[in-house]
């Protein structure tokens, strides 16, 4: 197992970040942690032209990769999908010789616009969020990464500021020590 001071790369992908109170609350403490690198994909790549070698270098330099994004149409925002397709290339993350991410950890941190009850067979979305997120889990497996249980903030816009602050504190504790069993 890795040391408790694991280096965390937090890849943040929100096309309307200025409107997301929940994500701002989650990100604020992460920016202060010495072991966490926050990388805002929409701020870095507003034109969607991703610097693949830079992104791959960031991945190589970190132990835990966190993908923080809002759930959009049962998936991630478009830039993050483009990032997956371009950065997690064969020969780097998968395929012959593609073992650069093997043994690292993958965690999704997701905000939704609906309550948890919407994500079940009798709910509005008809499927559990774990089913909807299966492509991310499969991508982590393809990269030989350890899949960590996603952190989900359901109905993020309807959470009170005190509820969001509580999530933010728990998230900060987890980011500071992400490989301790029983963490957030």
Curated annotation (Swiss-Prot):
Locations listed in the record: Cell inner membrane
GO biological process, one term: potassium ion transport
Membrane topology: Peripheral membrane protein
Catalysed reaction equations from the record: a quinone + NADH + H(+) = a quinol + NAD(+); a quinone + NADPH + H(+) = a quinol + NADP(+)
Example of a GO MF term: NADPH dehydrogenase (quinone) activity
Keyword Magnesium attached: no
GO terms under cellular component: plasma membrane
The protein's Enzyme Commission number: 1.6.5.2
Annotated InterPro entries: Flavodoxin_fold (IPR003680), Flavoprotein-like_sf (IPR029039), K_H_efflux_KefG (IPR023947), KefG/KefF (IPR046980)
First-level EC class: oxidoreductase
Main location: membrane
Short name of any one Pfam family annotated for the protein: Flavodoxin_2
HAMAP family: K_H_efflux_KefG
Family recorded in the similarity comment: Belongs to the NAD(P)H dehydrogenase (quinone) family. KefG subfamily.
Oligomer status and interactors: Interacts with KefB.
Annotated PANTHER family: GLUTATHIONE-REGULATED POTASSIUM-EFFLUX SYSTEM ANCILLARY PROTEIN KEFG
Task performed by this protein: Regulatory subunit of a potassium efflux system that confers protection against electrophiles. Required for full activity of KefB.
Protein's name in the database: Glutathione-regulated potassium-efflux system ancillary protein KefG
Annotated organism of origin: Cronobacter sakazakii (strain ATCC BAA-894) (Enterobacter sakazakii)
Gene name linked to the record: kefG
